[in-house]
């Protein structure tokens, strides 16, 4: 199997990206190293790279001859479908062969179907033929024929201008609701008298947030209030709604005091 290493990404002190550490790690990697990058709506932190940072990543990957594997499970949950795909286009325009793993489970509310796609950008027709041959072998020995129901649903929507327009509108509503929940959580924590600045939650994107809560505080949320979060402090913002936001904010305020 592959030897798997980690590279620096999240900076807890600034609630942002440790970009200096990330670049240093990329520059230390041997050529042909596969590097997994989140194209948008970073999971679990919710902290994304800026366009300028992506440009530096693309240049570094090209110079070091690395192999980017772009994980794009939440396209459309950041700004919009077009903007959220900008990192993929940067690699393609730079002539870099890369792999793109897309998921439609969340954006189409087909979580139980596990619908996705693997797209591979190659440098030539000859490389395409070789990659396709290897993919067929891997697929044949792993699952041979995938379930078709979820994929058929997604294809029907994307190939119909009317259905696609409706889907994009509804996806935008989902995105706006999540952003609203972020805003409400921040404002309600402030109203509860919490002096810690949680404004960073509003700058994060996608379904998740690194809240800054400790594992002990997360345990208290679970044991005392029946609110579940990951031990790292990651919370699912998409699980918040108008009926539970007050309860959650009040509980977080209590474990912080």
Predicted segment positions?
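Structural signature of PLP-dependent enzymes
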Residues: 132-151, 157-186
């Amino acid at each position: 199997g592959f030897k798997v290493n980690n590279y620096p990404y999240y900076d807890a002190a600034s609630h942002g990206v440790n970009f200096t550490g990330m670049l240093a790690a990329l520059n230390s990697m041997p050529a042909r190293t596969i590097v997994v990058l989140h194209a948008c709506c970073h999971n679990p932190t919710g902290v994304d790279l800026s366009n300028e940072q992506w440009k530096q990543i693309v240049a570094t990957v090209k110079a070091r001859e690395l192999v980017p594997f772009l994980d794009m499970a939440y396209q459309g949950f950041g700004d919009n479908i077009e903007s959220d795909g900008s990192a993929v286009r940067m690699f393609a325009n730079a002539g870099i062969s890369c792999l793109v793993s897309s998921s439609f489970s969340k954006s189409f509310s087909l979580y139980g179907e596990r619908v996705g796609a693997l797209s591979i950008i190659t440098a030539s027709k000859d490389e395409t033929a070789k990659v396709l041959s290897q993919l067929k072998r891997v697929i044949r020995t792993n699952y041979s024929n995938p379930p078709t129901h979820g994929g058929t649903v997604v294809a029907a929507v994307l190939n119909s201008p009317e259905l696609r327009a409706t889907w994009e509108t509804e996806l935008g509503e989902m995105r706006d609701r999540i952003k609203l929940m972020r805003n409400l959580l921040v404002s309600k924590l402030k109203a509860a008298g919490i002096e810690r600045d949680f404004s960073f939650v509003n700058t994060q994107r996608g379904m998740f947030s690194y809240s800054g809560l400790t594992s002990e505080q997360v345990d208290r949320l679970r044991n005392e209030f029946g609110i579940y979060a990951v031990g790292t402090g990651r919370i699912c913002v998409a699980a918040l709604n108008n009926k539970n936001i007050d309860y959650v904010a009040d509980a977080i305020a209590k474990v912080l005091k």
